[in-house]
């Protein structure tokens, strides 16, 4: 497999000091997404050559790198049009495929998640986790290595196994690999959870 896949699953190099400062500056220029606090780090938004936002018609060099769930194939949405809901309204679009929720649905939180939060790239489509009667914050992709580095592997993997989805994922979970973890943190109790998806 190493010959056919090369360094496909290698961890990216850490950002240099200048790159970190640049990313922080870019992040501060974005609207705040409570359920997706760093959409630049997760790849939901990218910085590139200036494009026209199809929602507001303004130029932006930071734009959505995924395609929203709608009839038209919409590209290059600016962060503001997602944050204020204008893009969702104009194109009858949603940015998240599915989410878990227990109890009575909260229409305001649903609106904020599905219509005003950038999604994330996954194998089978986003599945957003919830906790404490609210949606969790999406932090990015992880494998077992990253969970161990954070000191949360045992708890997070045990909680995931209790969901009775994929079983015994610890040996196979690789950041951005064919079996990948998607890390979330509760906005209230701060508990970490993962969702696992496979190609």
Could you describe each region identified by the protein language model?
Residues 2-4:
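Serine residues within intrinsically disordered or low-complexity segments
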Residues 16-199:
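Preference for intrinsically disordered or flexible, low-complexity segments
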